[in-house]
């Protein structure tokens, strides 16, 4: 659902995904849930949520904003992992260090890869913002 905006514009598909969801609605969800889902799709790439620029996000309460940041952050990382350069992912392990607020995400692939570091850094920022943690992504070849 987060990529439905591709049908209108590839570069801004995240913004168009949000607009389409808001315009058409989601039959199994309330209006508020639909707004939250639209924002999750909006922020799966690009800028971080901005209370000043995004009127819809600005009007959410604290819990709704946290939901957008957290689920959007998870979606953003997952979206980055579907990159052709990474290939088929065989396993993912997530460890959280409460003492240091570090989340280590180990991604296991069949082949050894060297992902684009700039892309990885961009993809983890919303997760870090939403969960108040530092993310360390590790790519490992499955043994």
Whereabouts are the PLM-identified features?
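C-terminal accessory subdomains of helicases
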Residues: 109-112, 123, 139
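A short interface-forming secondary-structure element
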Residues: 104-118
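Divalent metal-dependent catalytic cores for phosphoryl transfer on phosphate-bearing substrates
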Residues: 1-94
């Amino acid at each position: 659902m987060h990529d439905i905006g591709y049908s209108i514009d590839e570069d801004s598909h995240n913004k168009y995904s949000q607009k389409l969801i808001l315009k058409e609605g989601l039959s199994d969800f309330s209006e508020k849930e639909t707004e939250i889902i639209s924002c999750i799709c909006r922020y799966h790439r690009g800028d971080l949520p901005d209370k000043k620029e995004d009127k819809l996000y600005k009007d959410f309460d604290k819990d709704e904003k946290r939901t957008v940041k957290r689920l959007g952050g998870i979606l953003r990382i997952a979206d980055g992992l579907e990159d052709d350069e990474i290939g088929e992912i065989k396993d993912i392990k997530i460890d959280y260090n409460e003492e240091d607020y570090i989340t280590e995400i180990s991604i296991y692939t069949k082949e050894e890869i060297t992902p684009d570091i700039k892309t990885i850094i961009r993809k983890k920022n919303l997760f870090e913002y939403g969960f108040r943690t530092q993310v360390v992504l590790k790519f490992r070849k499955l043994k």
